[in-house]
Each structure stands twice: as structure tokens, then as C-alpha cells.
Amino acid sequence: MELKQEFPVSIEGQFLGGDGSTPRTTGNLCTPGTNVVMNGALTRQHCINSSSKTCHGDEWVTAEFEVDGAGSIKHFINGTLVLEYEQPQLDPRAPEANPLIIDGALSIDRGWIALQGESHPVDFREVSITPLD
């Protein structure tokens, strides 16, 4: 990540809580500097809502992300599949992604895992990484 970058170039699983009354999904996808393929078509939309139920109040939510390299990615919330896409790739239109594009290769098949709180307090517990075999 370069200095003064607003957000890291990433595939982001976004957690959002409800306000007690308004529907608001969690386990969404945000794609700063990246694109994905959904239902066979390249998707350039920055944030895509999942099909999850709203999680109101202070409750623990189980989130799982199944990532098969540059293949499929699935988001699960409380054990339910809520979002699925594939072929994560760098967006050549995004200036912050350009330094990461080597020999025209856009596919993202590796990277780092980060936990981040943007605007509200968040707690994480029992974080684990399990290889897909």
C-alpha cells in the first residue's frame, strides 16, 4: 500500500450493524481498486450488498469467508451463504492499483488478511484461518 492511499487495494468483506429498525445487510463486498466476476459478468460496482438478514444491537455474528485463490469467494453470515463471486482482479482504471499490475496480469491469487474498524467500534474473537484441502 502506498502512502496517502484512502483505502488499500483489496477485496473487502464489510460488516454493518443495524440501527434497530432499518434493514441493512452485513457480509457485503467492497472493492477499492479491484473488480470481481459475478454471475459470469465483470462487476465494477464498488460495494455490493449481500443477502444477509440485518443484525441489530450488540450480538455476536459468525462470519466466514471461503477463498479459493483467484477462483471463487463465498461469504457466509451465521452459517448462511449470503454472497458469491469469482476471479478477483486489479482494476486498471484505479491509479492506486496500477503499481500492483505486473506485465498486464490483473488476477489476484494471493495477499494479506487484515481486520479493520473504519467508523465504529468493533470486536473480533475466535479468528482462525483454515486451509482449503
What residues fall within each predicted segment?
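Carbohydrate-interacting regions of secretory-pathway proteins
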Residues: M1-D133
